[in-house]
Amino acid sequence: MGYLKRFALYISVMILIFAIAGCGKGNETKEDSKEEQIKKSFAKTLDMYPIKNLEDLYDKEGYRDGEFKKGDKGMWTIYTDFAKSNKQGGLSNEGMVLYLDRNTRTAKGHYFVKTFYNKGKFPDRKNYKVEMKNNKIILLDKVEDTNLKKRIENFKFFGQYANLKELKNYNNGDVSINENVPSYDAKFKMSNKDENVKQLRSRYNIPTDKAPVLKMHIDGNLKGSSVGYKKLEIDFSKGGKSDLSVIDSLNFQPAKVDEDDE
């Protein structure tokens, strides 16, 4: 009788151990599932990269929800900036945002130069209006600085030369989730052999051999949301107070009522 009790106790303990182990594996599966969901959510737009002719976006449909009014074809917003620590202990970033209205088939935006200081001084912000015609950036404001003018007129968005169709091959990401917002983040280590990394090094002054980290951020529903947004960051920072990164985003929302609201 005592043997049977001990045997029953042994079986109960083993069942409990397997149950706990099963829960652990369930959590891992759930975490892996979120990583895949984040990548699949990004793939909806990143599979279009490289978009060599931005005017192709006029004929590209995005995710639509109840925020769109009847007849509104929507608007694509493409954005790229390069940010780095400056000598003042703050941050400098420079880039462009362009709004491509599918209703009017027009594209307007601005090139921006921003300098943020560590303390004791307000940031400097300068915007230069641009438009795009025949896949060419046209500067609308007068710019005396010839180097800046050249950078604006020759600017290329990351999405015009990047190729992230192999995003599914990035694995073992560091995933964090805030269900209250909701927001989702995933980080993946990149290699300096990656063609996207080589492209960035050829276009920007990146004075480090450190391999970057690919950071993916989503605000809103993973399946899609016109009020949320997604952004990519390729982070070359060395850590500490050092900032060095390229930020990219391509989002689809209802067309703006006021095109000057930039």
Swiss-Prot record:
Localization per Swiss-Prot or TrEMBL: Cell membrane
InterPro entries: Csa (IPR007595), Csa_sf (IPR038641)
GO cellular component entries: plasma membrane
Keyword Membrane belongs to the record: yes
The protein, known as: Uncharacterized lipoprotein SAOUHSC_00402
Topology in the lipid bilayer: Lipid-anchor
Keyword Transcription: no
Lipidation residue positions, type S-diacylglycerol cysteine: C23
Signal sequence, start to end: 1-22
Family: Belongs to the staphylococcal tandem lipoprotein family.
